[in-house]
Amino acid sequence: MEEEARPAVGDGEAATPARETPPAAPAQARAASGGVPESAPEPKRRQLGTLLQPTVNKFSLRVFGSHKAVEIEQERVKSAGAWIIHPYSDFRFYWDLIMLLLMVGNLIVLPVGITFFKEENSPPWIVFNVLSDTFFLLDLVLNFRTGIVVEEGAEILLAPRAIRTRYLRTWFLVDLISSIPVDYIFLVVELEPRLDAEVYKTARALRIVRFTKILSLLRLLRLSRLIRYMHQWEEIFHMTYDLASAVVRIFNLIGMMLLLCHWDGCLQFLVPMLQDFPSDCWVSMNRMVNHSWGRQYSHALFKAMSHMLCIGYGQQAPVGMPDVWLTMLSMIVGATCYAMFIGHATALIQSLDSSRRQYQEKYKQVEQYMSFHKLPADTRQRIHEYYEHRYQGKMFDEESILGELSEPLREEIINFTCRGLVAHMPLFAHADPSFVTAVLTKLRFEVFQPGDLVVREGSVGRKMYFIQHGLLSVLARGARDTRLTDGSYFGEICLLTRGRRTASVRADTYCRLYSLSVDHFNAVLEEFPMMRRAFETVAMDRLRRIGKKNSILQRKRSEPSPGSSSGGVMEQHLVQHDRDMARGIRGLAPGTGARLSGKPVLWEPLVHAPLQAAAVTSNVAIALTHQRGPLPLSPDSPATLLARSARRSAGSPASPLVPVRAGPLLARGPWASTSRLPAPPARTLHASLSRTGRSQVSLLGPPPGGGGRRLGPRGRPLSASQPSLPQRATGDGSPRRKGSGSERLPPSGLLAKPPGTVQPSRSSVPEPVTPRGPQISANM
């Protein structure tokens, strides 16, 4: 800057020291000082310049979009001229707040003073009017230097000429008339004592014009500016948006109604006063002309509220024509305000819980649909219960909401909502976080009722399921059901082999599941080929241990792996983890159940099922062969199977090892869980697998001194969560045991000794019967 300024100086001044800076251009000086004249001291100029510019805060970032845009707007203010005020600056915010409070005071005080006060030259009244007129005049001047927000084009006018032109064309005339300092004129020339009645009435008319100023300020502030105030206060006090907006709207409605009643009450007394209280007006008829202003205001307010609420005429019906017209005007304004208040209040109440309102509207349509098709009562009840458990009284368009969000925010929400599912599944714990996120973003939430078939035997597998909450049973022909509960998954082998379901899966309780379609499953595994290899490796290992083979999986495993050496390590880790969990079922001592945690097991196969159910899911495949522990049946409750010892879940990354603590738990319903029931002396059920697929069942008698009750077909439970003994185990043609009365033994079976228990005596237990077919070792 100095190099450019030196040629303009004379030759005699060329030796001026460099520290003496030549005077800068006016525009450059204003830009350096933030739009403040150079005559002000440097610290004050910078401080004032900062107050006149928009600051970087949440509101400015929402308006302009970025820090860079805010800086550009600040540069616009600096280059616009001296004392140009940005409409979003801190100075304008505090000034508008002061004007808002002063405006509310004028809205309340001025009507009362103009209507009821006769002595208008008292010091308090003069001070109030002088301060009000001063602030209104200052606001009139500042409006010429404040940028104007053009709502049509979302543009902010900062050029002085553009601001002046637009303000002169809009609200300048109204502001000028309403800002005439009448009290200044009375104080300076002292004309008020010498004014006649007509001039005095003219002065009152000028005071009434002050309402135009107040209304113009309301329109200048704009509703958006009021919302901006409340948003900034909300951020300061850390209030939630819904609560803050609801409270503000309620206060706005109540305040507007009270303010209109206040104005109407003052108007009811002002009109008779301007007519010098004629004999047919309500003030003269009630002899209230010389009463105190408080009494007059109270009666006027009561009369106005009676009209506005349409509940009567007050103390008496109107007689004179002015009172009649005032009454009609009050009724019209009151009816309009009442309708607006009811409408806003209704909309406010509905907006407070819009999701529940949408649910109620949707369920009304469902009820009409059920009535139109004349559905039976039990079906209607199931539909009602489904909606209650699926939506829980609130309905959201979740796909639309998540689709409008950014991808990182959508992934964060999905990870948070599915955190319980991820925490219960070691498959996700051992997998890449990107794989977990890719799977979770493609899951679909589903709800099933007790008795619903989630998977039907013989159908083509198009989905796999992850269990968030609930209890399900795997059913196959001629086989006992196997339990699935929180944290388990099933159906992945059919997606890998594109085969058919070999068993059905039934919901025993209300189940909240997440499904993954075959297309999404393959898309995720194509993106993460190492996880496909891991799925296939674990599936083949499980099928191999139960003597099953799958040509499709073998062919895929023979193909070269596209992954690195770390993928093979992960596969070995998953397979080893799977085998360790399977061996943990056999290695658990019978007496350790009481010392372990009471958390229910994730897999609880009650009996060994035939080999045909092995491929239903990779988790079931292990559960079918590694359950060696006996399952006692309580003599006091034939319908309940009791856990004699803690059993580990089947080895699977999807079913983690969770110990069980034996404890008393009564079966309170058809779906009562049996994973934490005690083990009283009773018969125990054991089944072994044969290559022919037949379940060979035998019963072990209770220890000496134990009692027993008859196990008949009528005592079997109806619930799938409490399966019973087969009828051939308690047939009428089976031999009875000595001394047991009504107890019966199966016609044939294999007697097995539970691990860690004492073998009953030969007098109480018959010799084991050799099965017809060869047995598969459980240690496979």
Swiss-Prot record:
<dbReference type="GO" id="GO:0044316">
    <property type="term" value="C:cone cell pedicle"/>
</dbReference>
<dbReference type="GO" id="GO:0016020">
    <property type="term" value="C:membrane"/>
</dbReference>
<keyword id="KW-0894">Sodium channel</keyword>
<dbReference type="Pfam" id="PF08412">
    <property type="entry name" value="Ion_trans_N"/>
</dbReference>
<feature type="region of interest" description="Disordered">
    <location>
        <begin position="687"/>
        <end position="780"/>
    </location>
</feature>
<comment type="similarity">
    <text>Belongs to the potassium channel HCN family.</text>
</comment>
<feature type="transmembrane region" description="Helical; Voltage-sensor; Name=Segment S4">
    <location>
        <begin position="201"/>
        <end position="221"/>
    </location>
</feature>
<feature type="topological domain" description="Cytoplasmic">
    <location>
        <begin position="1"/>
        <end position="96"/>
    </location>
</feature>
<feature type="transmembrane region" description="Helical; Name=Segment S1">
    <location>
        <begin position="97"/>
        <end position="117"/>
    </location>
</feature>
<feature type="topological domain" description="Extracellular">
    <location>
        <begin position="274"/>
        <end position="296"/>
    </location>
</feature>
<dbReference type="Pfam" id="PF00520">
    <property type="entry name" value="Ion_trans"/>
</dbReference>
<feature type="transmembrane region" description="Helical; Name=Segment S3">
    <location>
        <begin position="171"/>
        <end position="191"/>
    </location>
</feature>
<feature type="modified residue" description="Phosphoserine">
    <location>
        <position position="634"/>
    </location>
</feature>
<dbReference type="InterPro" id="IPR018490">
    <property type="entry name" value="cNMP-bd_dom_sf"/>
</dbReference>
<dbReference type="GO" id="GO:0030425">
    <property type="term" value="C:dendrite"/>
</dbReference>
<feature type="transmembrane region" description="Helical; Name=Segment S5">
    <location>
        <begin position="253"/>
        <end position="273"/>
    </location>
</feature>
<keyword id="KW-0739">Sodium transport</keyword>
<keyword id="KW-0325">Glycoprotein</keyword>
<keyword id="KW-0812">Transmembrane</keyword>
<keyword id="KW-0406">Ion transport</keyword>
<keyword id="KW-0630">Potassium</keyword>
<keyword id="KW-0547">Nucleotide-binding</keyword>
<feature type="transmembrane region" description="Helical; Name=Segment S6">
    <location>
        <begin position="329"/>
        <end position="349"/>
    </location>
</feature>
<dbReference type="InterPro" id="IPR051413">
    <property type="entry name" value="K/Na_HCN_channel"/>
</dbReference>
<feature type="topological domain" description="Extracellular">
    <location>
        <begin position="192"/>
        <end position="200"/>
    </location>
</feature>
<feature type="transmembrane region" description="Helical; Name=Segment S2">
    <location>
        <begin position="124"/>
        <end position="144"/>
    </location>
</feature>
<feature type="compositionally biased region" description="Polar residues">
    <location>
        <begin position="687"/>
        <end position="698"/>
    </location>
</feature>
<dbReference type="GO" id="GO:0098855">
    <property type="term" value="C:HCN channel complex"/>
</dbReference>
<dbReference type="GO" id="GO:0042391">
    <property type="term" value="P:regulation of membrane potential"/>
</dbReference>
<keyword id="KW-0851">Voltage-gated channel</keyword>
<feature type="compositionally biased region" description="Low complexity">
    <location>
        <begin position="13"/>
        <end position="32"/>
    </location>
</feature>
<keyword id="KW-0915">Sodium</keyword>
<feature type="binding site">
    <location>
        <position position="502"/>
    </location>
    <ligand>
        <name>3',5'-cyclic AMP</name>
    </ligand>
</feature>
<keyword id="KW-0116">cAMP-binding</keyword>
<keyword id="KW-1133">Transmembrane helix</keyword>
<feature type="binding site">
    <location>
        <position position="494"/>
    </location>
    <ligand>
        <name>3',5'-cyclic AMP</name>
    </ligand>
</feature>
<feature type="topological domain" description="Extracellular">
    <location>
        <begin position="319"/>
        <end position="328"/>
    </location>
</feature>
<dbReference type="InterPro" id="IPR003938">
    <property type="entry name" value="K_chnl_volt-dep_EAG/ELK/ERG"/>
</dbReference>
<dbReference type="GO" id="GO:0005886">
    <property type="term" value="C:plasma membrane"/>
</dbReference>
<dbReference type="GO" id="GO:0005248">
    <property type="term" value="F:voltage-gated sodium channel activity"/>
</dbReference>
<feature type="binding site">
    <location>
        <position position="545"/>
    </location>
    <ligand>
        <name>3',5'-cyclic AMP</name>
    </ligand>
</feature>
<dbReference type="GO" id="GO:0003254">
    <property type="term" value="P:regulation of membrane depolarization"/>
</dbReference>
